């Protein structure tokens, strides 16, 4: 089974994250990317 994505790492879907939560965050460049909470 695939391992879960840790907090702060880019993610496609909530289910991919260890926290089961993937939300849009703004990075240092001002771009918005989905990362695990």
UniProtKB/Swiss-Prot annotation:
<dbReference type="GO" id="GO:0090729">
    <property type="term" value="F:toxin activity"/>
</dbReference>
<protein>
    <recommendedName>
        <fullName>Omega-hexatoxin-Hv1a</fullName>
    </recommendedName>
</protein>
<feature type="disulfide bond">
    <location>
        <begin position="11"/>
        <end position="22"/>
    </location>
</feature>
<dbReference type="GO" id="GO:0006952">
    <property type="term" value="P:defense response"/>
</dbReference>
<feature type="site" description="Critical for insecticidal activity">
    <location>
        <position position="10"/>
    </location>
</feature>
<comment type="function">
    <text>Reversibly and voltage-independently blocks both mid-low- (M-LVA) and high-voltage-activated (HVA) calcium channels in cockroach DUM neurons. Is lethal to many insect species but not toxic to mammals. May target the insect high-voltage-activated calcium channel Dmca1D. Also inhibits acarines calcium channels. An extremely high toxin concentration partially inhibits Cav1.2/CACNA1C, Cav2.1/CACNA1A and Cav2.2/CACNA1B calcium channel of rats.</text>
</comment>
<keyword id="KW-0960">Knottin</keyword>
<dbReference type="GO" id="GO:0019855">
    <property type="term" value="F:calcium channel inhibitor activity"/>
</dbReference>
<feature type="disulfide bond">
    <location>
        <begin position="4"/>
        <end position="18"/>
    </location>
</feature>
<keyword id="KW-0964">Secreted</keyword>
<dbReference type="InterPro" id="IPR018071">
    <property type="entry name" value="Omega-atracotox_CS"/>
</dbReference>
<keyword id="KW-0108">Calcium channel impairing toxin</keyword>
<dbReference type="InterPro" id="IPR009415">
    <property type="entry name" value="Omega-atracotox"/>
</dbReference>
<feature type="site" description="Critical for insecticidal activity">
    <location>
        <position position="27"/>
    </location>
</feature>
<keyword id="KW-1218">Voltage-gated calcium channel impairing toxin</keyword>
<keyword id="KW-0872">Ion channel impairing toxin</keyword>
<feature type="disulfide bond">
    <location>
        <begin position="17"/>
        <end position="36"/>
    </location>
</feature>
<dbReference type="Pfam" id="PF06357">
    <property type="entry name" value="Omega-toxin"/>
</dbReference>
<comment type="similarity">
    <text>Belongs to the neurotoxin 08 (Shiva) family. 01 (omega toxin) subfamily.</text>
</comment>
<keyword id="KW-1015">Disulfide bond</keyword>
<keyword id="KW-0800">Toxin</keyword>
<feature type="site" description="Critical for insecticidal activity">
    <location>
        <position position="35"/>
    </location>
</feature>
<keyword id="KW-0528">Neurotoxin</keyword>
<dbReference type="GO" id="GO:0005576">
    <property type="term" value="C:extracellular region"/>
</dbReference>
């Amino acid at each position: 089974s695939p391992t879960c994505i840790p907090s702060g790492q880019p993610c496609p879907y909530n289910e991919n994250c260890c926290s089961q939560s993937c939300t849009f965050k703004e990075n240092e460049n001002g771009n918005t990317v989905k990362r695990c909470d």
